[in-house]
Swiss-Prot record:
Keywords: Cell wall biogenesis/degradation, Glycoprotein, Golgi apparatus, Membrane, Signal-anchor, Transmembrane, Transmembrane helix. This is Beta-glucan synthesis-associated protein KRE6. Residues 299-694 form the GH16 domain. The chain crosses the membrane at residues 276-296. Residues 1-26, 177-186 have a biased composition (Polar residues). Gene3D superfamilies: 2.60.120.200. GO terms for cellular component: endoplasmic reticulum membrane; Golgi membrane; plasma membrane. Involved in the synthesis of (1->6)- and (1->3)-beta-D-glucan polymers of the yeast cell wall in vivo. It is required for full activity of beta-glucan synthase in vitro. It may be a beta-glucan synthase, part of a multiprotein glucan synthase or a modulator. It comes from the Eukaryota.
């Protein structure tokens, strides 16, 4: 017998050369591969169970009283072991005839130290079976020619996922025993060993059982891998052979530490072509940058370091250019025609022009600090629940007019954007004649828009509710129920919190000038609206609402009409709206011409709107105009004491100007389909006249100061999100009427 071992072989093949006549094809030819983990035939179940029933009998010493038959059987088993130990390994690995070459199960799983078990199984099989000498290999698995052929080369076994490598030391005895059919092997071996005892002999049977139950002498445990039945020790990753990726699967801590110390040099020595190309490209870019930013400037340096010497030039003109074109040196606009420098008052006297703005300078902007006289706030006018956001972008000057543009542009989660300008704390005046020339937006018969030209006392800033809380629209100089919350009336005539800066404010409380009732009354030059006929018989017509907003209120909001004049009942009438719990409105409405609007089939002209007032308690009056025609006059006596309140004088506060274009459901029904966005409210000029002997222009007059008080409460005038006086961190001043 000869035994050769080819390390490239994957499947061990057994070839037994003997002088004895062996007719068993299972040993004379290459063994057909089959799954060593396949099910055994039913006739072998008892034998298989016995072969694995004991693990202690493998190393038992020879019994001193064993019979000759037992001794003979033992010698025969050792003889068979000698034959198996000289097994000749098969073809090279690339040409093996196992499972992966035929598409079937791999061949025998060879393991050193297990051949003694197989020899015992063979000798035991010869004692038990004498008749099946030439059993086909295909019947070993118990199928015996049936459709359940476990050696079908096109049907791989259930657990045979990897071929058994030649020379592997870690194939378990379990797989070998289940693969080598003990019954068939014993039958074939019995045919060539006639001297062995029969299976009926008790002694022989006992010896055979001991042989079958002997376990493998393999030093490796019979553990199992998670890959379906193979012992974990035979998993291919544990095979001791070199592969290109072994350094990934079996890292070497020593080599890794050495690599970390010299990572750069190691990578530099072992870089591939791609890495080399990247390195070369980086070097080229570095050299190019060095050449462009260092070498080239150094080569082209001219050495010019001579200091600058002023150049002399010829004076072409003696004209003195202004530093800034927007800066005005006079309150009267230079573009105002001289014919407008004077205005005839109600009593026939001529009042002089004290302020004007013709808006002839193109491209003026009105962001905070941009303009001398007007500022466009960036706020939502929440006092009247407007639907637009006032944005400085919507205000500019062009073609000699101030343009307030409203468009359907989403802004700050509102769907409309428009413009407002106000002269708060920049330009104020006390009594006089205010005249504004304007062209109203959209059509004259479409309701919904709210154009406004108005004025308000400087102690309140329009749109900043914290500043107006308790001062708007008060014009009151008494210490009685008129200064208390709700006017001390339970009937709901007033929801106002009371006059914050009243005449009887306690000492130590903040007040602009203690002892004088202060407030922020409102006088509207015009609030544009449209008169509609509910019957539908008359066409809609634009009207101008001209009002005095005041507090505290008369009973039922009705003043003494004996001191009110209307000049043309065909176009003007007293407003049916006289006020509400937040203000009393002494108002009249005047019909407007359709040609004074932006759109329409007729001409689009500008019209003047204004008011004139004197605040003397005895001779004072307030008169409104549309064009040069007066529409309504209210005398001071119309605001005499009523109920539990006293006189409400015409405003002595410094009044600031407000020009705006709004839209709100609180004002009028909005005819959305008929509004042609964008719409523009255009103002041609603003002019203020005063009696020559009573000129009072400024926001901080001596007798009615505002500056110090505003500075003491500046957050109320700069933060539109503060909606009440107390939200600004202040408390209402105490007064002597309630108790100091």
């Amino acid at each position: 017998m000869a035994s050769q071992r080819d390390l490239t072989s994957n499947n061990p093949h057994f070839h037994i050369s003997s002088s004895r006549n062996n007719t068993n094809d299972d040993f004379n030819s290459d063994h057909n591969p089959r799954n060593p983990f396949g099910d055994e035939p039913e006739e072998e179940e008892e034998l298989d169970s016995a072969s694995f029933s004991s693990s202690s009998q493998n190393n038992q010493p020879h019994h001193p009283f064993a019979t000759s038959n037992q001794t003979s059987s033992t010698n025969n088993l050792h003889s068979t072991n000698s034959i198996r130990n000289e097994a000749e390994y098969g073809k090279p690995f690339q040409a093996y005839s196992g499972y992966y070459s035929n598409g079937g199960s791999s061949s025998y799983l060879n393991q050193e130290g297990v051949i003694s078990d197989e020899s015992r199984l063979l000798s035991s099989g010869n004692n038990n079976n004498n008749n099946n000498n030439n059993r086909d290999v295909s019947s070993v698995g118990g199928g015996g020619g049936s459709g359940d052929n476990r050696l079908n080369p096109t049907s791989p076994a259930e657990f045979d996922r990897y071929p058994s490598m030649a020379g592997s030391r870690v194939v378990s005895s379990t797989s070998l025993v289940s693969f080598n059919n003990p019954s068939n092997m014993m039958r074939n071996h019995h045919q060539h060993q006639p001297h062995l005892g029969s299976s009926s002999s008790p002694t022989s049977s006992s010896m055979n059982n001991d042989s079958i139950s002997d376990k493998s002498t393999s030093p490796f445990p019979n553990d199992f891998s998670p890959f379906g039945g193979y012992p974990a020790s035979s998993f291919p990753l544990s095979i001791d052979e070199k592969e290109p990726d072994d350094y990934l699967n079996n890292p070497d801590p020593v080599q890794d530490a050495e690599y970390e110390k010299n990572r750069f040099m190691h990578d530099l020595k072992n870089m591939d072509k791609r890495s080399l190309g990247g390195l070369i490209g980086f070097i080229i870019l570095f050299i190019a940058a060095l050449a462009v930013f260092i070498i080239l400037p150094a080569l082209t340096y001219s050495g010019a370091t001579n200091p600058y010497h002023p150049e002399s030039y010829e004076v072409l003109t003696k004209y003195s250019y202004p530093m800034l074109s927007a800066i005005r040196m006079n309150l009267v606009d230079p573009d105002t025609p001289e014919s407008a420098y004077k205005k005839k008052a109600k009593d026939g006297s001529e009042w002089v022009l004290v302020f004007s703005d013709e808006f002839d300078a193109e491209g003026r902007t009105f962001y905070e600090g941009d303009d001398q006289f007007f500022t466009a706030p960036d706020i939502h006018y929440d006092a009247t629940k407007d639907l637009e956001w006032y944005d400085p972008d919507a205000v500019t000057t062009a073609n000699g007019t101030l343009n307030l543009r409203m468009d359907a542009y989403k802004n700050h989660n509102l769907f409309y954007r428009s413009g407002m300008v106000q002269s708060w704390n920049q330009l104020c005046y006390t009594q006089g004649h205010l005249e504004i020339s304007a062209r109203l937006p959209n059509y004259g018969n479409v309701t919904g828009l709210w154009p406004g030209l108005w004025s308000m006392g400087n102690l309140g800033r329009p749109g900043y509710l914290g500043s107006t809380d308790g001062v708007w629209p008060y014009s009151y100089d008494s210490c009685d129920a008129g200064i208390t919350p709700n006017q001390s009336s339970p009937d709901g005539i007033s929801y106002l919190p009371g006059q914050r800066l009243n005449k009887c404010t306690c000492p130590g409380e903040l007040h602009p000038n203690r002892g004088v009732g202060r407030g922020a009354p409102e006088i509207d030059v015009i609030e544009g609206e449209v008169m509609t006929d509910s019957s539908g018989k008359k066409e809609n017509c634009g009207v101008a609402s001209q009002s005095l907003q005041l507090a505290p209120m008369d009973i039922w909001y009705i003043p003494d009409y004996n001191w009110v004049e209307i000049y043309n009942f065909s176009v003007s009438t007293m407003n049916t709206y006289t006020g509400g719990p937040f203000q009393q409105a002494l108002s009249a409405t005047t019909m407007l011409n359709v040609t004074w609007y932006e759109f329409g089939d007729n001409a689009h002209n500008f019209q003047t709107y204004g008011y004139e007032y004197l605040n003397d308690p005895e001779t004072g009056y307030l008169r409104w105009f549309v064009g040069d025609d007066p529409t309504l006059t209210v005398y001071s006596q119309a605001l005499h004491p009523d109920g539990n309140i006293g006189w409400r004088p015409l405003s002595k506060e410094p009044m600031s100007l407000i020009l705006n274009l709004g839209i709100s459901n609180n004002w009028a029904y909005i005819d959305w389909p008929s509004i042609s966005f964008p719409v523009t409210f255009r103002i041609d000029y603003v002019r203020v006249y005063q009696p020559p002997d009573q000129i009072n222009v400024g926001c901080d007059p001596t007798d009615f100061p505002t500056y110090d008080y505003i500075q003491q409460h500046l957050n109320l005038y700069e933060n539109a999100n503060i909606t009440s006086f107390e939200d600004g961190g202040y408390k209402f001043p105490k007064n002597s009427l309630i108790g100091c």
